[in-house]
Amino acid sequence: MSDVPTQFQDAKDLLTEDGFAVNDVWYHGTSSALWSSIKENGINRSGDRDLNKKAKNTMATIGNSYTETIQPVFLTQSKELAYLWAEKAVKRRSVRFEGDEMPVVLEIRLPDDLKDRVKPDVGAAAMVMISGDDYIGQLEDIYKANGIAFPDMDPVKADRMEYLNKLGMAYFDQNVPAECVTLVSE
């Protein structure tokens, strides 16, 4: 299990038998290397442009093409879960970039006219289907640490809201304006 710093361990306050409580505050985990750009430009869909550029160059070097896709901004209602995603971002970047990047958690407070655009991420079904997915394993550990049984979800039959409530998976299918984002960690 990941060593989530104490200041982000909010599952004890959010997690119930029904899953993670949802309110108007969202979190996004990423690398500290991206914070200065996010502070100026917000969180852009398709994520890490530098990492995408490196992937495109690598594919060109080996004679293959790379088609960049536009992905939404992935969110969660838990700082603890966002930290897990931030660790993944740092690990992904460490393969291609040198430096001392750290996981950071960003808080997102959307204006009223944008709040209803946050949707449950049913694309997470792939993680549920794959035995041994590390995020699902970490999530199981969080449930266990809080004395709650991990939900037995059938990804084909699960209600959309289960992906949000039980797995903490949501998305926002547009860029998040900079004025809506604050840094929770450094």
Which residues does each PLM region occupy?
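Alpha-helical interaction segments
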Residues: 16-18, 75, 161-162
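Short helix/loop capping segments that flank catalytic or ligand/cofactor-binding pockets
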Residues: 36-37, 83-85, 117-118
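ADP-ribose/NAD+-binding catalytic cleft of ART/PARP-like enzymes
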Residues: 1-70
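Short, well-structured hydrophobic secondary-structure segments
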Residues: 64-84
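Short active-site loop/helix that positions an aromatic residue
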Residues: 79-95
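A structural signal for short, well-ordered beta-strand segments and their strand-loop junctions
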Residues: 26-28, 74-76, 107
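Active-site and NAD+-binding cores of ADP-ribose-processing enzymes
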Residues: 2-5, 29-31, 50, 92-186
